[in-house]
């Protein structure tokens, strides 16, 4: 009987791996370094070795393993193929990951998903949106990632770009260039790096306005802390950031009408100083029937990816 499954969240520094029961119970989790040398040529064999090593340690036969799910930091086609180069994996990409890894594992079934989409799948299965059929997750970290789940299914899109929420255009007059090459992407305003960039711009534009952050090296967390403590200029940046994000979420709500929005990533740890104005701005922009859509913190944290990867395997 196939009672077990593995979930892998492949990142640029480490791969997080979880051994699960097919019911969703996490039995054990660990990490292995991601070897990005030589365009990541050893990545898949290292993942295979990690899974096989754990199977040997636990005395598991292939016949007991339902499959291995993998979340990767790039577009995925047909739950199998990574069609482009992934920059933060040393140029690794253009692989039929499912086929290649399955062969290395002696035929164990492998399915692959974009890491942000997979994290959303984890949250809707065992996290903040448990019990929902449709939900959208936004991850606010160094960039802005996203995952869209409709009727229990990840929306990958024709080109594997479904859920690229961070690259919704929110300011067509922006002159600064996003990492994707476009101008005015949500990521430029609502990511951790975007908050810092915009805060520095506010400081430059308001040289006579007192601010506790002036003359310091600060991170996004410091901006939210300053706003919480009554700093008017930091509060202005938080208001502008949440206004932009609220507008983007309202656009998504009018497109897919989810039961819930989940917000994760390091920026989400700011708490209500982020969520309270975000909900208010969302209501201003949202279509009337969507205005009360809940916007809540994601709860699985760094484990969302391994949960979602396993969900690819165990399905309904």
Predicted regions and their residues:
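A short alpha->loop->secondary-structure connector
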Residues: 157-158
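Short gly/Ser/Thr-rich phosphate-binding loop of adenylate-forming enzymes
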Residues: 95-101
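ATP-binding/phosphotransfer module of carbohydrate and carboxylate kinases, centering on a glycine-rich
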Residues: 1-67, 76-82, 101-108, 122-132, ...
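Adenylate-forming
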Residues: 120-125, 146-148, 167-168
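Short beta-strand segments
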Residues: 9, 69-73, 113, 137-143, ...
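Structural signature of FAD isoalloxazine-binding scaffolds in flavoprotein oxidoreductases
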Residues: 161-165
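A charged helix-plus-loop insertion that forms the helical arch/lid used to bind
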Residues: 81-93
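A glycine-rich, Thr/Ser-enriched phosphate-binding loop motif common to dinucleotide/cofactor-binding enzymes
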Residues: 112-121
């Amino acid at each position: 009987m196939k009672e077990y499954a593995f979930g892998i969240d492949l990142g640029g520094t480490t791969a997080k791996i979880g051994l699960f029961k097919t019911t969703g119970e996490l039995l054990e989790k660990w990490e292995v370094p991601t070897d990005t040398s030589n365009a990541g040529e050893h990545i898949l064999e290292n993942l295979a070795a990690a899974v096989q090593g754990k199977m040997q340690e636990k005395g598991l036969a292939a016949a007991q393993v339902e499959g291995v799910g993998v979340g990767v930091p790039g577009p995925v086609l047909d739950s199998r193929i990574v069609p482009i180069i992934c920059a933060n994996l040393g140029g690794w990409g253009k692989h039929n990951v499912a086929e290649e890894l399955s062969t290395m594992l002696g035929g164990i079934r492998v399915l692959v998903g974009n890491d942000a989409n997979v994290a959303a799948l984890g949250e809707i299965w065992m996290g903040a949106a448990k019990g929902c059929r449709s939900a959208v997750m936004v991850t606010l970290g160094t960039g802005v990632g996203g995952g869209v789940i409709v009727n229990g299914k990840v929306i990958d899109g024709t080109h594997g770009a479904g859920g690229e929420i961070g690259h919704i255009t929110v300011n067509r007059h922006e002159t600064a260039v996003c990492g994707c090459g476009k101008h005015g992407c949500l990521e430029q305003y609502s990511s951790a790096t975007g908050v810092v960039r915009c805060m520095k711009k506010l400081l430059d534009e308001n040289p006579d306005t007192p601010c506790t952050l002036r003359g310091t090296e600060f991170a996004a967390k410091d901006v939210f802390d300053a706003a919480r403590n009554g700093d008017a200029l930091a509060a202005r940046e938080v208001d502008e950031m949440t206004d932009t994000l609220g507008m983007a979420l309202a656009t998504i709500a009018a497109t897919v009408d989810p039961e819930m929005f989940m917000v994760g990533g390091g920026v989400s740890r700011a708490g209500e100083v982020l969520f309270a104005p975000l909900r208010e701005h969302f209501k201003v922009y949202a279509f009337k029937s969507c205005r009360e859509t809940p916007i809540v913190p994601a709860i699985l944290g760094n484990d969302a990816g391994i949960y979602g990867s396993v969900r690819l395997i165990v399905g309904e």
